[in-house]
Swiss-Prot record:
Binds 1 [2Fe-2S] cluster per subunit. Binds 1 FAD per subunit. This is Dihydroorotate dehydrogenase B (NAD(+)), electron transfer subunit. Belongs to the PyrK family. It holds the Pfam family NAD_binding_1. The gene is pyrK.
Length: 259
């Protein structure tokens, strides 16, 4: 159930180049039950920036009432958020959207989790949930270069983990699909989050497989009211049918929406 709460900053640190790990504490964490959901953050106490920023939920610790977000500080809003200090309050709206269907993976099956860049974080909570129900997980994490690689060790604690960098400075040189080809990786179910180019490449290969993708999209309201994040449905060539990434997604079955 969506709620709004001023949450306490427990810790914030830069874990890779311009990539920040922010831990917040508050009762809102008890509502965070579906990996792949996101929160809408008011990055500053004043009216500037006006719009909230959508950030995915990376890790949930309901015993401590804490959750972790990872984000890239690149625009005015996220750079402002990166300045928030321990003990300060952050206005959080969430959890929002529909997450990854953990129930679609069965114990004993193999799940392939593919993340690209800042699409990697929501896969961490998902992986933990899958492992807890006896699913074997394989992770492929794609980044531009070594300086922006993060959470490789944390994913490796949960299952086989491969890293690809476009420039070859760490792991396999190339894209996540190059890792799949190089190691002959197969799976029963696929979960993915990342840039559209990566999602399109996966859809081209696995449209007939059991697979779910999470879209990264700019949002205004985060609750389906402003229609800033609509995406069209593949089943309607006329383009009249659509879904909203913030409220209907961000996770969709592969092949459902136009990428």
């Amino acid at each position: 159930m969506m709620q709004k709460q001023n949450m306490i900053v427990v810790n914030q640190k830069e874990i890779a180049k311009n990539i920040y790990e922010l831990v917040l504490q508050g009762d809102l964490v008890q509502q965070m039950n579906d990996p792949g959901q996101f929160v809408h953050i008011k990055v500053a106490e004043g009216i500037t920036p006006l719009l909230r920023r959508p950030i995915s939920i990376c890790n949930v610790d309901q015993d401590k009432n804490e959750f972790t977000m990872l984000y890239r500080a690149e625009g005015q809003g996220t750079k402002t958020l990166a300045k928030r200090k321990q003990g300060e309050l952050v206005d959080v709206l969430g959890p929002l959207g529909h997450g990854f269907p953990v129930e679609e993976a069965e114990s004993g099956q193999t799940a392939l989790l593919v993340g690209g860049g800042i699409g990697v974080p929501p896969l961490y909570e998902l992986s933990q949930r899958l492992v807890a129900k006896g699913v074997r997980v394989i992770h492929i994490l794609g980044f531009q270069t070594k300086d922006v690689v993060f959470y490789e060790e944390k994913f490796a604690e949960l299952g086989d983990t491969y890293v690809a960098t476009v420039d070859g400075t760490h792991g396999t040189k190339g894209f996540v699909t190059d890792v799949i080809d190089s190691y002959g990786i197969d799976f029963d179910i696929l979960y993915s989050c990342g840039p559209l180019a990566m999602l399109r490449a996966l859809e081209g290969r696995y449209k007939e497989r059991k697979a779910y993708i999470s879209l990264e999209e700019r949002m205004g309201c985060g609750i389906g009211a402003c229609f800033a994040c609509v995406c069209h449905l593949q089943a309607d060539p006329s383009g009249h049918s659509y879904k909203k990434v913030c409220s209907d997604g961000p996770v969709f079955p592969i092949g459902e929406v136009v990428l």
